[in-house]
Structure formats: C-alpha cells, structure tokens
C-alpha cells in the first residue's frame, strides 16, 4: 500500500520494497511518488530543475536506517540473487536498486548514493549511513542504532557546507528491528512460562517534579510536558494490552 503524509518540513511515504517484478508492474506509480516526494518537500527551483536529469551539485541525498535504506554498508550481500536484475551484487537488500536510488535519480544525482563504510567513495552528492539490522533502541547490541548513524554523519559533516546540507534531502527508514525484537522478547511471557500467573503492573506517575533545564545555562523551572504526554499514552495503552494477554494466556491474571 502506498501512502503519503506531509507537513512543511517532513514527509512520510510508504512504499513496498522494490523488486524487479514490482518495479515493472508499478513503474509509473513509483515515479509519480518519487516526484511528489521531492516537489512537496522542497519548493526550490534548483531541485525542480534537477528532475529533468541535469546533474546539479547544489542538492544531495542522505539516507539513514536499516536494510531498506542500506546502500551497501553491511558487507555480506555481494552474491546472487542480490542485484540479479542488473547482474550487480552490490550489498543492497534488493534485486538491484533500493528506494533511495530511484529518489536520487529523480533529483538528478548521476550516481547512486555510496555507503559510508566503503573505502574511497565520493560523497559529494550525499551518502548512505543506513545499515541492515539497525534499530532505534539498540537491541540486539550487535545492531547499529539511529543515533550512531547520526553520529557518523556528524563526524563527516566537514565534507559538506551548511547551505548544501540545508538543501539536501534526508531519508529515514527504521523501526522494523525494534518491533521484531519486541515481539520476540517478552519478559512477562517468560515469567509466565516459569509458572508465574499473577501480576501487578503499576501505572507510570506524572512527572510533576521533573524540571526542564537548559543544558547550557542550567536555567528553567517549567515541567517538561512532553514527558507527561508520553506517560499518559503509556498508561492509556497498557490496560488493553494486559487484558489481551490475559485472554490469550489462561490462568494469568493482572492488575494495573
């Protein structure tokens, strides 16, 4: 299913993993979405002109995330069938190209965005910081987190001027590993398998005493309300979740 959500600075776009058959079947739709992505996010004639295929060094593309946006940083997919549609196993989790490759083409970038962990690459027009199995929360420990990818970008920032960075597109796809690991690792389920059957889970308290202070000036006496918003969401959702667990696990009771 294809979906697009946007505001004045961010755009969320849902596109399935590109395969050779899918590309042949939905070529026009993917092209349309790619053009929409660039035109709706940027109202800049330089970028619009670049869509005509003209190489324009004023814009670049940077990608972060997991295997969907891994430009070849996880070095074990250099064999068939990866890259089979181009006869070019390039380390990407696809049969040839991934979504950022098509977006780069729409933006007039002549070469595919290179993986940063590959030596001697040209990052003039951007770079791929995404790594397969990456997660937000960092579990398992062997995976790279989004924060670590951003740190890598920070360490390389001197390669680009601020104006170029401001004009460039930053694409992020991450979260699959976090959801997968959450469904595989459930401490309560483990306790239940060890014969525990009665659970009391206390709701989170409102952070009335937490004071948000500027990290540089150490000033500020206002409560940081975004934390309380998260607490409220947590407390609203945990009850129905526990009820579902009780229904699917006979003999388990819980109170919250």
From Swiss-Prot:
Organism domain of life: Eukaryota
Signal peptide: 1-49
GO cellular component: extracellular region
Pfam families: Lipase_GDSL
Family of the protein in this entry: Belongs to the 'GDSL' lipolytic enzyme family.
Catalytic residue list: 67 (nucleophile)
InterPro entries (alphabetical): GDSL, GDSL_Est/Lipase, SGNH_hydro_sf
Enzyme class, spelled out: hydrolase
Main location group: secreted
EC number: 3.1.1.-
UniProt protein name: GDSL esterase/lipase At1g18120
Glycosylation sites per record: 181
An example molecular function term from Gene Ontology annotations: hydrolase activity, acting on ester bonds
Record keywords: Glycoprotein, Hydrolase, Lipid degradation, Lipid metabolism, Secreted, Signal
Coiled-coil parts of chain: none
Single GO BP term: lipid catabolic process
Organism: Arabidopsis thaliana
Subcellular location: Secreted
């Amino acid at each position: 299913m294809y979906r697009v959500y946007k505001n004045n600075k961010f755009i969320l776009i849902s596109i399935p993993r590109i395969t050779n058959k899918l590309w042949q079947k939905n070529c026009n739709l993917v092209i349309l979405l790619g053009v929409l992505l660039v035109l709706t996010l940027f109202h800049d004639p330089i970028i619009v002109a670049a869509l005509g295929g003209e190489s324009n060094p004023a814009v670049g593309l940077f990608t972060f995330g997991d295997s969907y946006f891994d430009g070849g940083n996880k070095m074990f997919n250099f064999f068939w069938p990866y890259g089979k549609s181009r006869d070019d196993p390039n380390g990407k989790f696809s049969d040839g190209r991934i979504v950022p490759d098509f977006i780069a083409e729409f933006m007039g970038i002549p070469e595919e965005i290179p993986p940063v962990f590959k030596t001697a690459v040209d990052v003039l027009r951007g770079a791929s910081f995404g790594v397969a199995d990456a997660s937000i929360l960092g579990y398992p420990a062997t995976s790279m987190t989004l924060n670590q990818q951003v740190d890598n970008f920070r360490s390389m920032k001197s390669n680009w001027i601020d104006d170029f960075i401001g004009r460039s597109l930053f694409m992020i796809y991450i979260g699959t590993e976090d959801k997968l690991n959450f469904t595989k690792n459930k401490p309560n389920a483990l306790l239940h398998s060890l014969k525990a059957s009665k659970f009391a889970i206390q709701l989170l308290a409102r952070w009335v005493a937490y004071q948000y202070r500027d990290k540089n000036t150490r000033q500020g006496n206002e409560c940081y309300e975004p934390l309380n918003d998260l607490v409220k969401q947590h407390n609203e959702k945990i009850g129905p979740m526990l009820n579902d667990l009780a229904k699917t696990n006979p003999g388990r009771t819980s109170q919250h």
